[in-house]
């Protein structure tokens, strides 16, 4: 194995700005062996930092070739360069570049996260490195709680985390006092003795004199490359690398993906918690949008259910036949062709379950010294089945009562309360106009389809109503109940055809509750869709807010992105981290929005509304899906911008 670790051949680096080109490195040739301690010295603007960036795979040459351990890396892509940074290099920056939200241990762990080292193993190694550097009592301290010298030692530990075969130190004493600076140089010298290849970049000859070899650079060219007076090259270390830079065992890909995801999730939570108010305001658009969608769907479901329930109170699967051409026909009162025989003939049609004739009038009902106005309806024995009424007390009359014109009545719960209070009305006699009738049954309370739930209702056999009370042979209407799964439109047409044949003309109209129900369902669905579309607009606005804040976050955390790239993060790692953060913000907003929707439902139910909001599990699931998709869609652009940052520019950003 060759002792040459890093080799540069005819390397040039130029920067182009518009029509101008600036050559920073000009045909550099350089070899650095394993175990050397090299100082690159030059004034500001000499090109020394650019050379360090190329050597550390943070930058690529414009021309020429660069070899690491015999491999030409001058044309590699960014992700391949990131892999080399993880495997070979550890960076010590003048300004430390520690991540302010992480503890000392967590900062040291960062390179190992991107190297795929399992959590437990990397934590143990980070703690061990910090202990060796005298920071065993500062493991859980954040950078703001450490002195400058302590922060620099944390950065040294981070550089050694993945082995640090080559340590690149950029002005390592520049931000330290003289005592801490001496300690840092002693530490680097110790690492050199352990076999690490140390490359110092400095303008200070006092620092450079710690190196075995001093390379002077001026105007992008190497003007001197000399050995120090007391050259001590650790030949043995070059042949046998020290245990201090043995790399931790690499994990399989699932560990790499999982730990990277967990790390990105933790960083997202830290970023959110460090800017709580901004995070909340970012979520607010998502919260309002999700709450609006879920609440609107719940309101639509609740109102639809209430309307359908009201329609059901008119009768389940019923078709009503009324005289005239339709509602509002002024001549309907003169149509006297609907008869009981028509009702009997309708019973013979297929899919017909039961039929009831009906006559109605408003009469005064009297009992003892009480009187009130009630709606009195003459109906057949099947009326209560057709309309879905249930008995509370007593019984309904039968066919014999209808045939015998029995003076029997069934009253509703409102009539019972009005006329009898707490007394049992069964067997009592009341007067309907001048006709006495005996109460045989009381129906259970039932909401009226049109909201007139306080009206008094009394039912008698239609024959009694026709023969004893009104003296008319024609009916006010016929109600037909059809089978549960019958095609209501076809049955309705059969009813029309039969009655047209019997009457010789169509002097009646029909009311199909199934048609009404379908129309209401379509109308409700359309209104729900319309209002939901408006709510979706607020979701989009919220998504734009997320994107804006994430763009701000990328700008604020540019240096953090540069540090992560320097220690080996690929573009995909940075993209994933910021994308997870955007999705997490939107998911939290979605959860809060669903919670707000339930609070709205609770307030709505306690406000005395006539119906309840009915929440749909589908709408809740879609709310989660939408919030996730919004996070991905509106978080992708900021995340991509973060991933495409140049690590050198990111590290230089203030």
Curated annotation (Swiss-Prot):
Q: What is its EC number?
A: 7.6.2.-
Tell me the leader sequence span.
none
Q: Which residues span the membrane?
A: 280-300, 529-549, 584-604, 619-639
- General function of this protein: Part of the tripartite efflux system MacAB-TolC. MacB is a non-canonical ABC transporter that contains transmembrane domains (TMD), which form a pore in the inner membrane, and an ATP-binding domain (NBD), which is responsible for energy generation. Confers resistance against macrolides.
ABC transporter domain location is 6-244
How does this chain sit within the bilayer?
Multi-pass membrane protein
Location comes to: Cell inner membrane
- Name the family: Belongs to the ABC transporter superfamily. Macrolide exporter (TC 3.A.1.122) family.
Q: Does the keyword Cytoplasm apply?
A: no
- Gene Ontology molecular function: any one: ATP hydrolysis activity
- Enumerate the Gene Ontology biological process terms: response to antibiotic
Instruction: Tell me one Pfam family matched here.
Output: MacB_PCD
Q: What is this protein called?
A: Macrolide export ATP-binding/permease protein MacB
Subunit composition and interactions: Homodimer. Part of the tripartite efflux system MacAB-TolC, which is composed of an inner membrane transporter, MacB, a periplasmic membrane fusion protein, MacA, and an outer membrane component, TolC. The complex forms a large protein conduit and can translocate molecules across both the inner and outer membranes. Interacts with MacA.
Q: Which GO terms describe its cellular component?
A: plasma membrane
Q: Where does ATP bind?
A: 42-49
Give the record's keywords alphabetically. Answer: Antibiotic resistance, ATP-binding, Cell inner membrane, Cell membrane, Membrane, Nucleotide-binding, Translocase, Transmembrane, Transmembrane helix, Transport
């Amino acid at each position: 194995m060759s002792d040459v670790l890093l080799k540069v051949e005819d390397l040039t680096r130029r920067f182009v700005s518009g029509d101008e080109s600036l050559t920073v490195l000009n045909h550099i040739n350089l070899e650095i062996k394993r175990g050397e301690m090299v100082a690159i010295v030059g004034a500001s603007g000499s090109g020394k930092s650019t050379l360090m960036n190329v050597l550390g795979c943070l930058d690529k040459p414009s021309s020429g070739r660069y070899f690491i351990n015999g491999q030409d890396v001058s044309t590699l892509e960014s992700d391949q360069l990131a892999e080399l940074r993880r495997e070979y290099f550890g960076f010590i920056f003048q300004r430390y570049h520690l991540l302010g939200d992480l503890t000392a241990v967590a900062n040291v762990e960062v390179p190992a996260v991107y190297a795929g080292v399992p959590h437990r193993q990397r934590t143990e190694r980070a703690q061990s490195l910090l202990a060796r550097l005298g920071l065993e009592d500062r493991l859980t301290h954040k950078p703001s709680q450490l002195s400058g010298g302590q922060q620099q030692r944390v950065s040294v530990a981070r550089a050694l985390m993945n082995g640090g075969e080559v340590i690149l130190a950029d002005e390592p004493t520049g931000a330290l006092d003289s005592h801490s600076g001496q300690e840092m140089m002693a530490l680097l010298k110790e690492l050199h003795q352990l076999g690490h290849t140390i490359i110092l970049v400095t303008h200070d000859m006092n620092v450079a004199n710690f190196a075995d070899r001093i390379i002077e650079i001026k105007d992008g060219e190497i003007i001197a490359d000399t050995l120090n007076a007391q050259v001590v090259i650790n030949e043995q270390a070059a042949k046998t690398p020290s245990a201090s830079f043995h790399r931790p065992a690499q994990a399989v890909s699932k560990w790499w993906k999982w730990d990277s995801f967990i790390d990105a999730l933790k960083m997202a939570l830290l970023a959110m918690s460090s800017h709580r108010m901004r995070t909340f305001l970012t979520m607010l658009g998502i919260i309002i949008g999700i709450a609006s969608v879920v609440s609107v769907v719940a309101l639509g479901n609740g109102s639809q259910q209430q309307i359908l329930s009201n329609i059901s109170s008119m009768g389940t699967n019923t078709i009503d036949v009324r005289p005239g051409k339709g509602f509002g026909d002024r001549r309907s009162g003169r149509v006297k062709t609907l008869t009981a025989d028509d009702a009997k003939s309708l019973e013979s049609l297929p899919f017909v379950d039961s039929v009831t004739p009906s006559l109605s009038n408003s009469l005064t009902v009297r009992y003892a010294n009480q009187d009130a106005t009630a709606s009195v309806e003459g109906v057949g024995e099947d009326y209560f089945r057709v309309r879905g009424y249930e008995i509370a007390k007593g019984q309904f009359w039968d066919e014999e009562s209808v045939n015998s014109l029995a003076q029997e009545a069934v009253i509703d719960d409102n009539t019972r309360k009005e006329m009898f209070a707490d007394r049992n009305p069964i067997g009592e006699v009341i007067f309907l106009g001048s006709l006495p009738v005996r109460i045989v049954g009381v129906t259970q309370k039932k909401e009226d389809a049109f909201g007139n739930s306080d009206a008094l209702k009394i039912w008698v056999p239609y024959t009694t109503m026709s023969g004893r009370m009104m003296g008319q042979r024609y009916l006010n209407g016929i109600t037909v109940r059809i089978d549960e799964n019958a095609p209501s439109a076809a049955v309705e047409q059969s009813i029309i055809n039969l009655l047209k044949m019997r009457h010789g003309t169509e002097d009646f109209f029909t009311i199909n509750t199934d048609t009404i129900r379908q129309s209401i369902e379509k109308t409700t669905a359309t209104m729900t869709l319309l209002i939901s579309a408006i709510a979706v607009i607020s979701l989009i606005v919220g998504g734009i807010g997320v994107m804006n804040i994430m763009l701000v976050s990328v700008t604020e955390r540019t240096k953090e992105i540069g540090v992560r790239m320097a220690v080996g993060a690929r573009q995909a790692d940075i993209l994933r981290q910021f994308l997870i953060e955007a999705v997490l913000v939107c998911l939290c907003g979605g959860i809060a929005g669903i919670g707000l929707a339930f609070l709205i439902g609770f307030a709505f139910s306690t406000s005395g509304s006539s119906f309840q909001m009915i929440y749909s599990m589908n709408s809740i699931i879609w709310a989660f899906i939408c919030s996730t998709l919004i996070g991905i869609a509106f978080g992708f652009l900021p995340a991509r911008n973060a991933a495409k940052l140049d690590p050198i520019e990111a590290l230089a950003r203030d």
